[in-house]
């Protein structure tokens, strides 16, 4: 990956925001599932 020709690409901050949100969402669902008891099967 090179920093040249970044036009037309998704901004890095947008990628970080989306990835961070998805990661937090998955962690929240996993911890909630394990707290309720559904995640114990995982």
Swiss-Prot record:
Gene3D superfamilies: 6.10.250.2070
Membrane topology: Single-pass membrane protein
Protein name, UniProt field: Photosystem II reaction center protein J
Top-level division of the source organism's lineage: Eukaryota
GO cellular component: chloroplast thylakoid membrane; photosystem II; photosystem II reaction center
Transmembrane feature ranges: 10-30
Similarity remark: Belongs to the PsbJ family.
Function: One of the components of the core complex of photosystem II (PSII). PSII is a light-driven water:plastoquinone oxidoreductase that uses light energy to abstract electrons from H(2)O, generating O(2) and a proton gradient subsequently used for ATP formation. It consists of a core antenna complex that captures photons, and an electron transfer chain that converts photonic excitation into a charge separation.
Protein's UniProt keywords contain Plastid: yes
Compartment(s) where it occurs, according to its Swiss-Prot or TrEMBL record: Plastid, Chloroplast thylakoid membrane
A family per Pfam: PsbJ
Predominant location category: plastid
GO BP of this protein: photosynthesis
Presence of keyword rRNA processing: no
UniProt entry keywords in alphabetical sequence: Chloroplast, Membrane, Photosynthesis, Photosystem II, Plastid, Reaction center, Thylakoid, Transmembrane, Transmembrane helix
Gene giving rise to this polypeptide: psbJ
Subunit structure: PSII is composed of 1 copy each of membrane proteins PsbA, PsbB, PsbC, PsbD, PsbE, PsbF, PsbH, PsbI, PsbJ, PsbK, PsbL, PsbM, PsbT, PsbX, PsbY, PsbZ, Psb30/Ycf12, at least 3 peripheral proteins of the oxygen-evolving complex and a large number of cofactors. It forms dimeric complexes.
């Amino acid at each position: 990956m090179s920093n040249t020709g970044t036009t037309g690409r998704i901004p890095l901050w947008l990628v970080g925001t989306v990835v961070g949100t998805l990661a937090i969402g998955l962690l929240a669902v996993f911890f909630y599932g394990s707290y309720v008891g559904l995640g114990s099967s995982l």
